[in-house]
Amino acid sequence: MSDDKKIIFSMQGVSKIHPPNKQVLKDIYLSFFYGAKIGILGLNGAGKSTLLRIIAGKDESYQGDVVFTPGYSVGFLEQEPELDEAKTVKEVVKEGVADTIKLLEEYEDINKQFEKPEVYEDPDKMEKLMERQGKLQDKIDSSGAWEIDQTLNRAMDALNCPDEDKKIEVLSGGEKRRVALCRLLLQKPDILLLDEPTNHLDIESIIWLEGFLNNYPGAVVIVSHDKMFLDNVT
């Protein structure tokens, strides 16, 4: 979804107090359009991560007004992302393209249906199945689903993800963040919220990420201590 002339998010007079009485945000105003690129700088403890959590809808204990236009998807990279420890790296990354994989699975199921006598001996069933297959193939073609394996491998290589067969439970914190970032970028949400995305990335991966975000059609809000990265992206 896109409408670069429409404000899709608005925050008015938002404040946040941590018990017993520590104010981390005070009277914050923020609005942005689809496609906006926003960088957030601040001292440690200034409430940057809290601000992202409020935008993501993960923190609702604040004062003020937050308005999100319905129909826009949000993706959030937290500093300590939650991943299924029992899954492999490849399985987690594939969660980012779950809808695309469903298209391919449905297409394979249709092909199996053609092999059944009760289908290929019935002209009406064959016609309906062929029509369904044609519509599905159009979706697959337009989404680039045929190249999904190459897409996954390129993204994992670009972010220097661990071996695809490794279990999440054995990964370091930095490796988990790279896997989570890879999954999130493949999801392509309308709004990307990135909390210190360059942490644990090498220079080649940072350069790749800069290019990816510069070409990203949706809105991007980044918290980062890396001013050069922010200058290159926002």
Feature-to-residue mapping (PLM):
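ABC ATP-binding cassette signature C-motif
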Residues: 1-234
